Amino acid sequence: MNQWMELADRVLAGAEVTDEEALSILHCPDEDILLLMHGAFHIRKHFYGKKVKLNMIMNAKSGLCPENCGYCSQSAISKAPIESYRMVNKETLLEGAKRAHDLNIGTYCIVASGRGPSNREVDQVVDAVQEIKETYGLKICACLGLLKPEQAKRLKDAGVDRYNHNLNTSQRNHSNITTSHTYDDRVNTVEIAKESGLSPCSGAIIGMKETKQDVIDIAKSLKALDADSIPVNFLHAIDGTPLEGVNELNPLYCLKVLALFRFINPSKEIRISGGREVNLRTLQPLGLYAANSIFVGDYLTTAGQEETEDHKMLSDLGFEVESVEEMKASLSAKS
């Protein structure tokens, strides 16, 4: 038995990954990558079998953000030529939900730029979500920025299932990425979502000049936060942002990162998110031996892979898509 299978068995028995073991995952020799992914899949299969959860993003409000996040094309300091618009209307949100349903995508993610939502924007999301739930029954994830307790309660009461607010990087590295809000602001929003009964979703962006220890720290911080769903983004450096031209990643390292997140957060939904196409490239399929969830279609301001290609990839791997009906049954069992 190789060392990664031994570690996987210890994790399944309840052991926690030490920093030394975590570093050994990130330093795994490239020629041993299949052994590492075998260990990660041993854990993934225990909790999720061969099922893959599909998610789709609706960019409900673009640009116009006062924050100074260095990776983001929508920030106040970005010079990237993106389309900016205020919150889309209800019909547009419903059209996106229909498209997700028709493509057998179980989770519909409503994302809005900005520091946090106005009460009017929450009203708009609430109004649309109620009809989406009645018509399509999709799992709804909202990502609207820093959240107030009363806003979280309104979203939960309307039928929103999950709230996403990423920690993005380690506490130590946070001020290198943004200074317009604190790391604790982000943690607080996830806690507010949890306290309201929303399923907490929080993840990371890898490739922002962080150290390997930073990667380990963010994976362990998300474990401590008890995020149900963990999106792992890989930086897609956009021209016009402070991180323009940064390209520190390669496909094999990205696989090691995904394996690390699975070993540290064994039972959680690990989602391969933004930047997978440009960073994992031809090794995208291998990522699903650690992760059990992906975004399908376009991201916020960057293009994704064609939906048909994603379905083909999953079929070729022998994995099974969690259908909309299975997702509905799962939600009913939890309620």
Curated annotation (Swiss-Prot):
[2Fe-2S] cluster binds at residues 109, 141, 201, 271. Homodimer. Pathway: Cofactor biosynthesis; biotin biosynthesis; biotin from 7,8-diaminononanoate: step 2/2. Binds 1 [4Fe-4S] cluster. The cluster is coordinated with 3 cysteines and an exchangeable S-adenosyl-L-methionine. Binds 1 [2Fe-2S] cluster. The cluster is coordinated with 3 cysteines and 1 arginine. This is Biotin synthase. Keywords: 2Fe-2S, 4Fe-4S, Biotin biosynthesis, Iron, Iron-sulfur, Metal-binding, S-adenosyl-L-methionine, Transferase. Belongs to the radical SAM superfamily. Biotin synthase family. The gene is bioB.
